[in-house]
Structures are given as structure tokens and as C-alpha cells.
Amino acid sequence: MKHAIRLTLLLGAALAAATALRAQPPTIWARVEPDSIQIGDRFTYTIEVDRDLVQVVEFPEFGEDPDSGIELVESLPVDTLSREGRRLHLRKRYVLAAFQEGRFHLGRAEALYADKNIVDTLRTDEELQLFVSTFEIDSTSHTIFDPV
């Protein structure tokens, strides 16, 4: 009888340990730095993901859209910021430039992840925004030089 109770407790502990070791879903954060720029200035769009070693994460690729007013300047490689046990903290940065004035609603950052046979989309909780302002050119306070 004692042997059966001991075996049951051992199996219960093994099941609890296996459940605790099961991979947690990845988490995602994103930010825009700076969030307010002048026309033609560059800004950094950063996505960070904390994931398990067995999970695969695909970061978005930005295509050319001349009507968007935002242009991709450089897509930097994925950085591994830290590794704690089975968890990896990854960062993907994009350098972008804005060529239209206004407030841009960039929406929620997204990344695809695969865990075993499951493919899903990760989305941030907050929506990102970028404010692009123009600079004033005051031609009345300066005399225009005419070489004629």
C-alpha cells in the first residue's frame, strides 16, 4: 500500500514538473524612438520578443510603398540581448524615414511565431504612433541675394 501511494506521489510530481517546464508563449514589445520628428528625419522602430529556445520567431519585412510617406532606410540584424535558461530575449530594429507631415498610426507591432505545429501571430498591446512636423521657412526676414 505504501509503495502504491509513493508511486502515485512520484507520478504526480513528475506530471507537475512536466507541466511547469512546458514552453510559455512568447511576449512582444515595440517602440518608436523618437516618437516626434521633422520631415526627412530618421527614426528607429524596435520590436523585442522574449521566447523559448524551441520557438521560432519571424519579424516583419517592410516593403516599398511610395504612398505611405515612410521609407525603410535600413533593416538591422536580429540581436540576442540575453539568454536565461531556455528563454531568449531578441531585438529587431528598423531605421525608417518620414517624408510627409502628419500623425502616422503605425498600429500594433506584429511577429509570427511557430511552436511545434502551431503558427500564430504575436501582437503588442499598445498601438504605436509617430508625429511628423514640418519646419517653417521665413523668407520675409531674410533678404534674397540676386547676383544680377
Regions found by a protein language model. Give the residues of each.
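Bacterial N-terminal signal peptides that target proteins for export
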Residues: 1-9
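Bacterial N-terminal signal peptides
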Residues: 8-18
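Surface-exposed interaction/ligand-binding surfaces
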Residues: 23-148
